[in-house]
């Protein structure tokens, strides 16, 4: 088995060899895992089982907080068709709003758009990803957790200030710099934080773990 830790409440498990590609065996194993978690931790969990990480993730979210959704390869298209575009990992509020402006709300709607239009609207990388994702195509392997990479930018203001617009302008500038680095390195992120030092040298910070990985800052 290959275990990939994603966050404090999310992980992927490749059990292809253990279950010999049999979805009935995979379903039985998933129920065993759910029961074990309930017995030992007194917690419920949602599990999605499918042929790749993308569909497994969507299936896991489908019946939260205590569901088990099995999507075999020949049922992927039928499963995805009525779902809202937002269920695709990486599609955030801004992208969803852009699709609404194009009168596109479901995955079935979005499948009417060709890859060239998506690439023109969202860039080649994102456009191609979305074109494949809505068709259930994903070859991202389950892999052991890699060492976390942190991207950050820091600045010292020319003057102390409580002016919201002034502070926001500087923050947006830092966000753009970090975003440019992320795009240059072809990375995605799932956690984001801000750290600042006040005029009396006290420190404050705030961080958040996102629902899905994204490259949109």
Regions found by a protein language model. Give the residues of each.
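DNA-contacting surface of Y-family translesion DNA polymerases
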Residues: 100-217
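Gly/Gly-Pro- and Ser/Thr-rich, intrinsically disordered tail segments characteristic of DNA damage-repair
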Residues: 1-129, 142
């Amino acid at each position: 088995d290959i275990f990939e830790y994603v966050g404090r409440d999310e992980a992927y498990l490749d059990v292809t060899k253990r279950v010999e590609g049999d979805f009935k065996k995979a379903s039985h194993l998933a129920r065993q895992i759910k029961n074990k978690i309930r017995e030992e931790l007194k917690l419920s969990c949602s599990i999605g089982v499918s042929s790749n990480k993308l569909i497994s993730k969507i299936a896991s979210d489908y019946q939260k907080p205590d569901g088990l959704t099995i999507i075999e390869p020949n049922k992927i298209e039928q499963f995805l068709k009525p779902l809202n575009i937002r269920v695709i990992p990486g599609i955030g509020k801004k992208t969803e709003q852009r699709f609404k402006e194009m009168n596109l709300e479901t995955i079935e709607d979005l499948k009417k758009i060709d890859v060239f239009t998506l690439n023109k609207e969202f860039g080649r990388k994102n456009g191609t990803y979305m074109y494949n994702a809505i068709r259930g195509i994903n070859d991202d392997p389950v892999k052991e957790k890699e060492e976390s990479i942190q991207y950050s930018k820091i600045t010292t203001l020319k003057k102390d200030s409580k002016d919201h617009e002034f502070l926001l302008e500087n923050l947006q500038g830092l966000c753009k710099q970090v975003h440019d680095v992320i795009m240059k390195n072809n990375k995605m992120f799932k956690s984001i934080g801000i750290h600042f030092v006040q005029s009396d040298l006290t420190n404050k910070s705030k961080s958040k773990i996102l629902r899905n990985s994204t490259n949109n800052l």
